[in-house]
A protein has these predicted regions:
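Conserved P-loop NTP-binding catalytic core
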Residues: 44, 48-50, 54, 64-115
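A short catalytic or substrate-binding loop motif that flags glycine-/basic-rich loops and adjacent residues
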Residues: 12, 88-91, 223-225
């Protein structure tokens, strides 16, 4: 499954409707094709999408909308999704997610969501209505009409028969099972200011050396239900830790965040999923950030169409993109 476009209306933090497009809308030059992912024929997707702006300009909010839309089409319960906070106390928010599925169909999922305050004062979200449109991509005459469903009737609508379905889970779950399709999401939204390395069995030595050349060994070991971390610097004795949080005493925040990020990059490039990173430059120098971007913008490495979506304060990162 590949996301083509996301639109949102009725969100408290946005005065205007939000419209985010992930496919190229203009003609693609031959030299640009290597940095894009070819969907089919002349349709290409952007593999590295950046939202650039000053503080409090809404970058993180946009990332939360994308995360919410992705989780809806992945059949995650809205009330369990971290990015649900973007809905606030909305009376009626409409999110349309346009995607391309394994059957070579372009689909549009419209999800209408409302908030209700619980006894504890927290907002609880439920889906008021849902509709799904679809059309074979072969019937689309040009890019202009790729996500245009004007005049078409939905192929499915949410109804009361779906009593077995939780009221915060999208009915697109049936479509996904039928098409044997899903979307893989890796999010670093919660790692913006928290850097605790989660358990991982495979940290490539090349990645560790790139982030900190003084590290000779870093690996996790699980024995009898306990986790041990082996850390060794060059020309020094090995250190054994039993708590990942203790790594902060020995490794910089940039190294920890780098290991987390590059481990996820490996998964995303393999699965063709989505990696969301807020404030990508946090603890990273420009060289590391541009290396990350180039992983996704190299069609030889990114054969499955993995997508990096990130926010940043640094406009100089735009130099990595070809602009009109």
């Amino acid at each position: 499954m590949k996301i083509l476009r996301i639109t949102a209306q009725g969100l408290p933090l946005f005065k205007k409707d939000l419209d985010i497009c992930f496919y190229t809308q203009q003609r693609v030059c031959e030299e640009d094709k290597d940095s894009l992912y070819r969907l089919t024929d002349n349709y290409y997707l952007h593999s590295a999408c950046a939202f650039i702006g000053i503080n409090a300009s809404g970058k993180t909010s946009v990332l939360k909308v994308i995360s919410l839309a992705l989780n809806i089409v992945k059949n995650e319960p809205i009330n369990h999704v971290e990015a649900k906070s973007i809905l606030g106390g909305t009376k009626k928010a409409t999110i349309r997610t346009y995607f391309y599925d394994k059957r070579s169909y372009v689909c549009c999922l419209e999800t209408v969501i409302a908030a209700k305050k619980s006894k504890t004062g927290e907002y609880v979200y439920s889906i008021l209505s849902e509709s799904l449109w679809e059309k074979p991509i072969a019937t689309v005459k040009s890019k202009k009409y790729l996500t245009d469903f004007t005049g078409m009737k939905p192929v499915e609508q949410r109804n009361s028969d779906e009593a077995y379905l939780s009221d915060d889970v999208s009915f697109v779950i049936a479509h996904n099972k039928k098409a044997n399709d899903t979307v893989e999401i890796f999010s670093l939204l919660s790692y913006t200011n928290v850097n605790v390395l989660p358990f991982t069995e495979d940290i490539p030595l090349e990645v560790i050396a790139f982030l900190d050349p003084t590290i000779e060994k870093l690996c996790f070991e699980q024995t009898e239900g306990k986790t041990f971390i082996h850390l060794k610097f060059k020309d020094e004795e090995e250190i054994i830790l039993n708590n990942a949080a203790d790594l902060e005493q020995y490794l910089s925040s940039g190294t920890i965040k780098g290991i987390i990020t590059f481990s996820m990059v490996k998964e995303v490039l393999h699965s063709g999923g989505y990696l969301l990173v807020d404030e990508i430059e946090n603890h990273f120098n420009k060289e590391i950030v541009t290396t990350l971007m180039r992983f996704f913008m190299d069609s030889r490495l990114n054969k499955n169409g993995g997508t990096l979506i990130f926010t940043t304060h640094y406009p100089e990162l735009l130099d990595e993109y070809d602009r009109n």
